[in-house]
């Protein structure tokens, strides 16, 4: 390990470019309809949860969004600043000023002014408030819908996985090795869950959850009965959607029975072997000897 002496040497810390993405997660029509402001939302445009992450290569593995149960969240009519398309977004009220300038806000009963790509100020108005706990259970569309969430069914599986497999035998399949059993669980994923660890110190107050990356994500997903998004290789082993370099696996590396059951081959083929593309921001990280 590194000693405190080594970590305090001159030049040990440096500003470098790190990766960051604010993702748009589109609510399903049924979920929009559950909101009191549904009519206002539908009359303006599509509605999205927005979630910020510094690990964009984990986004293909997203299966849930986590909100703070007691935080104040707002529905906002605005524009996509890159395309100028009218959209609705949902985020923590406390974080609005980090994404939208106060100069662009108009009253709820005032029509939004027009916006064009390149304009400096993005118009917006807040049309409703919700506590995080009111958003629990709302569903959104899979961000990259090429692979369905799958879990392994064995003696180590969580009870919610075993119970789901027993209740849905039509979704259970055996890997090509004729040994390992799996269950497709798309219906249980892509919904909002609650977490006390969510903060409004940065980001949007909505946390993107990828159970295959990190113990915290895995635990909160398991507690909420959220399946993970795996790939299954030819040995019947589970692998994350991308490797540690952020590259999509090739189809020829995957179990054929898994591909037949859970993969949209046409869509996946467009991306196999590619790297997840990232935006960049300056972030202070430690530069240790040898890096």
Language-model regions, residue ranges each:
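Active-site cores that bind ATP or allylic diphosphates and position pyrophosphate for catalysis
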Residues: 1-50, 57-59
